[in-house]
């Protein structure tokens, strides 16, 4: 028989068989997750990457089928958890699922915004595989809880008073911020005030659809990720001594000192 691949792909019965197999395999995997956690985690460590690619590869069309099989490492519990388990333990008032992307779990947990999220009593998913962030971004949310990368934009953790104070500080130091941008010579798009940085003097975040970790991954691809760069924002802690030193240097016209800090 000479049957083309295109003919098979369009055949209604083949589609029906494929969908039936997908559901059967999914149900078997979910039963393993529920009834034999140790066995499922062994399976996940071997094949979890393929499930994530299954969600990302078809632009999220199968996310409803596969998303409850996903597992990520929990910063609070120090073990693999599902998205359902994350949501079940969310404190009242938490509106998003927070995650960090990077190479090492230990390093991610020390990031300024990671410590902020954890200090609020919220858990943090530590995503160390290159496909993780692409998968979560294409999903956008899970059970109406939006995924938020801790290093991408507003985390929604500031109080109204903190927001107002940050706006006032930014207005008062507009010229200083422009000088810092100039000193960094195009490496950042903007300078902002972030009063939630606790003991950290600065933090680097990104805006838009491409994060700093995604940029690193894209650069490793054959095309080199040409034109796929993250939009970086320097965040300053207005309550830290470094900010005070920058202000003093600006007021004194000490450009060299600002360049040194930058």
Residue ranges and their predicted role:
Residues 1-262:
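Conserved GHKL (Bergerat-fold) ATPase module
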């Amino acid at each position: 028989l000479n049957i083309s691949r295109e003919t098979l792909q369009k055949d209604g019965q083949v589609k029906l068989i494929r969908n039936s197999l997908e559901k059967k395999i999914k149900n078997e995997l979910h039963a393993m997750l529920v009834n034999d956690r140790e066995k499922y985690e062994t399976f996940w460590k071997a094949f979890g990457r393929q499930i994530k690619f299954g969600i990302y590869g078809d632009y999220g069309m199968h996310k409803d089928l596969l998303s409850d099989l996903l597992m990520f490492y929990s910063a609070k519990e120090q073990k693999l958890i599902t998205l359902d388990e994350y949501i079940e333990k969310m404190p009242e008032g938490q509106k998003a699922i927070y995650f960090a992307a990077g190479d090492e779990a230990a390093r991610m947990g020390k990031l300024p915004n990671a410590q902020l999220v954890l200090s609020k009593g919220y858990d943090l998913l530590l995503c160390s595989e290159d496909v993780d962030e692409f998968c979560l971004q294409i999903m956008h949310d899970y059970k109406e809880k939006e995924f938020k990368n801790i290093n991408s934009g507003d985390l929604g953790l500031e109080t109204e008073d903190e927001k107002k104070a940050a706006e006032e500080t930014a207005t008062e130091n507009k010229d200083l911020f422009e000088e810092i941008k100039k000193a960094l010579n195009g490496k950042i798009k903007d300078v902002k005030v972030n009063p939630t940085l606790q003991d950290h003097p600065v933090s680097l975040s990104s805006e838009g659809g491409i994060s700093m970790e995604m940029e690193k991954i894209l650069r490793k691809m054959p095309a080199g990720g040409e034109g796929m760069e993250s939009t970086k924002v320097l965040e300053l802690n207005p309550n830290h001594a470094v900010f005070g030193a920058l202000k003093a240097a600006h007021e004194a016209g000490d450009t060299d000192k600002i360049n040194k800090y930058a």
